[in-house]
Design a protein with these regions (language model features):
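Metal-dependent nuclease catalytic regions and adjoining charged, substrate-binding loops involved
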Residues: 234-299
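Metal-dependent nuclease catalytic cores that hydrolyze phosphodiester bonds in DNA/RNA
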Residues: 1-197
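Hydrophobic/aromatic-lined pockets within catalytic cores
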Residues: 81, 85-89, 211-215, 234-238
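An active-site-proximal "capping" alpha-helix that borders the catalytic cofactor pocket
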Residues: 223-234
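Short, structured patches in soluble enzyme cores that scaffold and shape functional sites
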Residues: 179-181, 210-211, 247
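Coil-to-beta-strand transition motifs
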Residues: 191-195, 202-204, 238, 251-253
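Conserved catalytic cores of phosphodiester-cleaving nucleases, focusing on short active-site segments
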Residues: 77-78, 198-215, 229
Length: 299
């Protein structure tokens, strides 16, 4: 009897929205390869590329620390926007309050050279941001002897054109930054909890900030945040259907807008979740961080 009860115990899984994005990238690895590796002698083979995408996905599931200047730059931009949405620059300057979360900020004037030697130098206002992702650990261990301190990353300094940042801040006037959303979806294999942090939540729309070196229209069409977050918000009693990716290459801004429709999007969401569950069950032996095999409440 006990064995039968154990066999029929329903399974419960969990995944955050951008993990589904990584899973989608893994599924699309071969298609992506033939889209971008178009030279006669590509630097990697299609098999090597697919293997890399597999390793990247497993590392993300296992929460292996990953750092890159591009990722840090994007995080610093996001935190800067959040800081100025919560408390405008004028008030920060008046209160001498130029720190927030992991950043310190100030306004500077950049001198920009033209493309040609004969072009005049122009001036442009910018935010200078010192980004310290290990700030909390640094503060907490400041009094410890050097030999006992953990190895911490050095702070990095980034500059962002003020007009670009201010466009985001103005657009998000009145928004709630970094809102945690969650919801549960029934699948053929059990329940899966979906969750994540919405960058900016407005009364009638949900927004995610994306930074990229190069942007092409529809870049985020295959991502899952524009389905997961409205799905979760609906379950939380917040009937927001409109989702925007607000994108910058640090010089210009772009938007992709999506409207959530339950009858169309929930079956798609269920399908990707069931494929994800099959993947993690098949690869259970290499998954060391087992959070994906448990509900949000059972961690």
């Amino acid at each position: 009897m006990m064995a039968n009860q154990q066999a029929t115990t329903p399974k419960h899984y969990s995944a955050y929205a951008t993990l589904l994005d990584s899973f989608q990238s893994y599924l699309d690895a071969e298609k992506t390869y033939y889209k971008y590796f178009t030279s006669e002698n590509p630097s990697v083979t299609v098999d090597e590329w697919c293997d890399k995408m597999y390793v990247d996905l497993i590392n993300k599931i296992n929460r292996v620390p990953f750092t890159s200047e591009a990722a840090d730059r994007g995080t610093a931009f996001n935190e800067l926007v959040d800081a100025l949405v919560k408390k405008p620059l004028a008030k920060r300057a008046k209160d001498n309050d130029m720190e927030s979360e992991n950043i310190m900020l100030r306004v500077v004037v950049l001198q920009l050279k033209g493309r040609r030697k004969t072009d005049p130098i122009t001036e442009k206002a910018a935010y200078e941001v010192v980004f310290d992702p290990d700030k909390d650990n640094r503060d907490r261990t400041a009094s410890q002897p050097d030999e006992e301190k953990p190895q911490l990353r050095e702070p990095q300094t980034f500059t962002f054109f003020k007009d670009v940042v201010d466009e985001f801040v103005t657009y998000y006037d009145g928004a709630l930054p970094q809102v945690f959303v969650k919801g549960s979806l029934e699948t053929h294999f059990g329940t899966i909890d979906l969750y994540g942090y919405a960058d900016e939540l407005m009364p009638f729309s949900c927004h995610d900030i994306k930074t990229t070196k190069n942007y092409h229209a529809g870049n985020f069409k295959e991502h899952w945040q524009h389905i997961v977050y409205p799905f979760c918000l609906h379950q939380m009693g917040v009937p927001v259907d409109l989702f925007e990716y607000n994108i910058t290459n640090f010089k210009e801004t772009f938007s992709e807008v999506y409207a959530f429709k339950e009858e169309r999007d929930i079956p798609k969401l269920r399908d990707i979740c069931e494929r994800f569950i099959q993947f993690i069950e098949t690869n259970r032996d290499v998954i060391t961080d087992t959070k994906v095999f448990h509900s949000l409440n059972d961690r």
